[in-house]
């Protein structure tokens, strides 16, 4: 009999009394153990079952009592479980078997969680994997790990097997280091135990002490020589011996954990491979085009024929959102020197302004991006790349008088070329174009329409490094002075006929905040051939457009008829006809507001009537000799 009950016994007694069992019935059941022990097959009443619980409580402090052992021998599957390591005690000498049983009995009497932490610390100190414990004891790997790491309860029989292995391993390791210090064979003590380990040797595992030494050496030298590796071997083995609490002279007792020169070589090789892999992974991560706002990259200035430049990355432009996927178009541009054609292929991204209907778009996939000898093109999605024209395009700095034409289906940059090449260069079938002409004697910022919502809303200034010559003093481009002599041209966007019309379903045109932003000359014409735009005299014409009556508009004709614009020139040799590539649609593409077109001969007051604040008109400058033959 024990003089004092444990906490578990006290809780069990309290549970028995709370279940309705009286103290007298409990004492009576304890006084009659015979019927209780033989009642395993028959039905038991409360007194007998509770008495059985009390009978087991008396033997709990012994730890290895027969009653408790019979309880723990039953595994989860209901079968008797006897660890194989306990059966091996019979093979030992009686003195050794008695010693191990005594030590295991002592460990079983202690706190299981404290003993579990002690066993785990020993495994870490000697770099012993849990697999070796599982192979020797027959315990479940998961159950053993949870017991050592979290203190999960384990039955006494299984804990006895774990503690038996722990005691035996301590003895085995001590013998290894002892024989290593004496110069004897270290395999003799473990030779008889090889069958219990299922013939498997422990895999080498780097200890924390050795890893610290190796990482410090790797920082100094990533590929040490053989002499340096041998020095590291001695340092690692010394650290491993100190970690185990033995003398460095007994390093041979480390067994499978002995550090060798080959293992050090492999460790450094693996570290170099890992570093190279991480470097390659980082390079692959940052090698792609960096996403973010800003103008997309321009086409390379030194593109060779037949080699398409890299695709333009889509850029986020203020007021513009990207819609349909990009398609690629190819345009052939005659060079100014009469050389071979230069073919450039670049994607035109379908974009739509924020104020436009989903069915509309600013840049159609039908357009072509034309590049000439003047230099690289600005991105298709925006004209703001012209800000960096001086820094990024030396070729354009030398020839600042390039004509930049922008129509809604596309954007074109045309450099100085031969007169014969102007015709195919300026041909942009299927679109009308808003062309802004300039005449000034000073270097100035040219406004370029950058973003379009329900109307032309944003004027983006573009700084030119050299002054533009006035129309009555110098020609725009000497090679083509007989065809374009009145003024230099800077082009921006507009569209009067297209399935993706800009002003469809918009009641009125919004105003500009500034009325003097644009220079002196603006005209609306078809751009199939601009060679006839010469020697135009100033006057004023007013075109009115109605969304319902297309016959009243000078800009709309029925779909079954074609429109021809005749622009006479002072030079009879340069008189040509501008034929639109497509028939103008009768569908409402412009609001019912009137379209007033001016041209002023005086350059000083020309900006005062351009784009007034009235929402119902757009005032631009146009020639008097432009006529519309609406049929």
Swiss-Prot record:
A motif (Nuclear localization signal) lies at residues 197-205. Gene3D superfamilies: Homeodomain-like, lambda repressor-like DNA-binding domains. Pfam families: HNF-1_N, HNF-1A_C, HNF-1B_C. Residues 199-279 bind DNA. Residues 40-81, 183-205, 283-358, 545-567 are annotated as: Disordered. Changing residue 272 to C: In NIDDM; loss of function in positive regulation of DNA-templated transcription. Changing residue 117 to E: In MODY3; uncertain significance. Changing residue 206 to C: In a hepatic adenoma sample; somatic mutation. InterPro entries: HD, HNF-1, HNF-1_N, HNF-1_POU, HNF1_dimer_N_dom_sf, HNF1a_C, HNF1b_C, HNF_P1. Residues 130-132, 143-149, 155-158, 203-206, 263-265, 270-273 are annotated as: Interaction with DNA. GO terms for molecular function: DNA binding; DNA-binding transcription activator activity, RNA polymerase II-specific; DNA-binding transcription factor activity; DNA-binding transcription factor activity, RNA polymerase II-specific; protein dimerization activity; protein heterodimerization activity; protein homodimerization activity; RNA polymerase II cis-regulatory region sequence-specific DNA binding. Changing residue 191 to D: In late-onset NIDDM. Changing residue 127 to W: Abolishes transcription activation. Changing residue 186 to Q: No effect on transcription activation. Residues 1-31 are annotated as: Dimerization. There is a cross-link at residue 117 (Glycyl lysine isopeptide (Lys-Gly) (interchain with G-Cter in ubiquitin)). PROSITE patterns: HNF_P1 (PS51937), HOMEOBOX_1 (PS00027), HOMEOBOX_2 (PS50071), POU_4 (PS51936). GO terms for biological process: D-glucose import; glucose homeostasis; insulin secretion; liver development; pancreas development; positive regulation of DNA-templated transcription; positive regulation of transcription by RNA polymerase II; positive regulation of transcription initiation by RNA polymerase II. Residues 288-298 have a biased composition (Pro residues). Residues 87-182 form the POU-specific atypical domain. Changing residue 132 to K: Abolishes transcription activation. It is found in: Nucleus. Liver. It is linked to Hepatic adenomas familial: Rare benign liver tumors of presumable epithelial origin that develop in an otherwise normal liver. Hepatic adenomas may be single or multiple. They consist of sheets of well-differentiated hepatocytes that contain fat and glycogen and can produce bile. Bile ducts or portal areas are absent. Kupffer cells, if present, are reduced in number and are non-functional. Conditions associated with adenomas are insulin-dependent diabetes mellitus and glycogen storage diseases (types 1 and 3). Maturity-onset diabetes of the young 3: A form of diabetes that is characterized by an autosomal dominant mode of inheritance, onset in childhood or early adulthood (usually before 25 years of age), a primary defect in insulin secretion and frequent insulin-independence at the beginning of the disease. This is Hepatocyte nuclear factor 1-alpha. The gene is HNF1A.
């Amino acid at each position: 009999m024990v003089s004092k009950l444990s906490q578990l016994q006290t809780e069990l007694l309290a549970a028995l009394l709370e279940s309705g069992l009286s103290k007298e019935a409990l004492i009576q059941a304890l006084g009659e153990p015979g019927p209780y022990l033989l009642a395993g097959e028959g039905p038991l009443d409360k007194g007998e079952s509770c008495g059985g619980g009390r009978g087991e409580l008396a033997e709990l402090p012994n730890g290895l009592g027969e009653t408790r052992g019979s309880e723990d021998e039953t595994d989860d599957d209901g079968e008797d479980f006897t660890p194989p390591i306990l059966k091996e005690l019979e093979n030992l000498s009686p003195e050794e078997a008695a010693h191990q049983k005594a030590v295991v009995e002592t460990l079983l009497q202690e706190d299981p969680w404290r003993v579990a932490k002690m066993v785990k610390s020993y495994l870490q100190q000697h770099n012993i994997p849990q697999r070796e414990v599982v192979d020797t004891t027959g315990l479940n790997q998961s159950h053993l790990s949870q017991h050592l790491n979290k203190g999960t309860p384990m039955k006494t029989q299984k804990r006895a097997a774990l503690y038996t292995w722990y005691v035996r391993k301590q003895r085995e390791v001590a013998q290894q280091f002892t024989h290593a210090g004496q110069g004897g064979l270290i395999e003799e003590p473990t030779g008889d135990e090889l069958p219990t380990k299922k013939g498997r040797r422990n895999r080498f595992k780097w200890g924390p002490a050795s890893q610290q030494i190796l990482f410090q050496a790797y920082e100094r030298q990533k590929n040490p020589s053989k002499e340096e590796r041998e020095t590291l071997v001695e340092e690692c083995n010394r650290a491993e011996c100190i970690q185990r609490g033995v003398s460095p002279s007994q390093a041979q007792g480390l067994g499978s954990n002995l550090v060798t020169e080959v293992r050090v070589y492999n460790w450094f090789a693996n570290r170099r491979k890992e570093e190279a892999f991480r470097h390659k992974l980082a390079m692959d991560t940052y090698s792609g085009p960096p996403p973010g706002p800003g103008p997309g990259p321009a086409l390379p200035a030194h593109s060779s024929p037949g080699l398409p430049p890299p695709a333009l990355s889509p850029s986020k432009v203020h007021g513009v959102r990207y819609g349909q996927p990009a398609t690629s178009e190819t345009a052939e541009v005659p060079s100014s020197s009469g050389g071979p054609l230069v073919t450039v292929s670049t994607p035109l991204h379908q974009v739509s302004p924020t104020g436009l209907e989903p069915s509309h778009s600013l840049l159609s996939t039908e357009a072509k991006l034309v590049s000439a000898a003047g230099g690289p093109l600005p991105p298709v999605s925006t004209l703001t790349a012209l800000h960096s024209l001086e820094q990024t395009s030396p070729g354009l700095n030398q020839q600042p008088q390039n004509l930049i034409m922008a129509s809604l289906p596309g954007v074109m940059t045309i450099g100085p070329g031969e007169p014969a090449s102007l015709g195919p260069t300026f041909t942009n079938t299927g679109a009308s174009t808003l062309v802004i002409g300039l005449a000034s004697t000073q270097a100035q910022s040219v406004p370029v329409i950058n973003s379009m919502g329900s109307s032309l809303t944003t004027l983006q200034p573009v700084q030119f490094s050299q002054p533009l010559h006035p129309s009555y003093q110098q020609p725009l481009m000497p090679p083509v002075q007989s065809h374009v002599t009145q003024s230099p041209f800077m082009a921006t966007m507009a569209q009067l006929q297209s399935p993706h019309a800009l002003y469809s379903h918009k009641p009125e045109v919004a105003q500009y905040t500034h009325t003097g932003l644009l220079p002196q000359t603006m005209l609306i014409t078809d751009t199939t051939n601009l060679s006839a735009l010469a020697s135009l005299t100033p006057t004023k014409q007013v075109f009115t457009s109605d969304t319902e009556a297309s016959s009243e508009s000078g800009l709309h004709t029925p779909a079954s008829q074609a429109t021809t614009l005749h622009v006479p020139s002072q030079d009879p040799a340069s008189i040509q006809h501008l034929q639109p590539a497509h028939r103008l649609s009768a569908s409402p593409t412009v609001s019912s507001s009137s379209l007033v077109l001016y041209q002023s001969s005086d350059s000083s007051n020309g900006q005062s009537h351009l784009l007034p604040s009235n929402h119902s008109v757009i005032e631009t400058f146009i020639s008097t000799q432009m006529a519309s033959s609406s049929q």
